[in-house]
Amino acid sequence: MNNKSILIAGGGIGGLAAAAGLAQQGFQSIVCEAAPELSEIGAGIQLGPNAFHCFDYLGVGDTARANAVYIDSLRLMDAITGKDIARIPLDKTFRKRMGNPYAVVHRADMHKALLDYCINSQLIEVRINHLAERYEQNGNNVRLYIKNESPIDGLALIGAEGLRSNIRQQM
């Protein structure tokens, strides 16, 4: 990849989804992940209809549906009595109205689906063991400084490293 790439700091679901979305629009990207390997971590996440719509656009909607556990309702319960305070049915009527289901899926399943997409795309380069330390904006370009590696130049930078991000702190 060259300096016409969009740089993405963070190889989690957000960073990989950003890379996949950019590839859908024909943009090259370089994903820089601090971890020495991309492994299955995390727990369950809730996916609303809008998330399924996004995953469909990114080409991993079928994977989301295949790995999802569909729930009948969302329940807000009193912590002391355990009684329902409110209940939102998530049945066929909900799915028809929203165009997609509401479900729960393991984070690792979605991460793997997005990672597979990114690895198989000629527009995306994924680099592990690349801790983004800081960046510099230079006119129409950005330079990303990686710990123990040469800096990487690109058109723009997306910070997707999470709450303890060096890039987030600098921005």
Enumerate the language-model features and the residues they cover.
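Conserved N-terminal Rossmann-fold NAD(P)-binding element of oxidoreductases
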Residues: 9-10
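Conserved N-terminal helical subregion
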Residues: 2-6, 23, 52-171
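N-terminal Rossmann-fold NAD(P) dinucleotide-binding loop
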Residues: 15-16
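Conserved N-terminal glycine-rich FAD pyrophosphate-binding loop of Rossmann-like flavoproteins
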Residues: 36-56
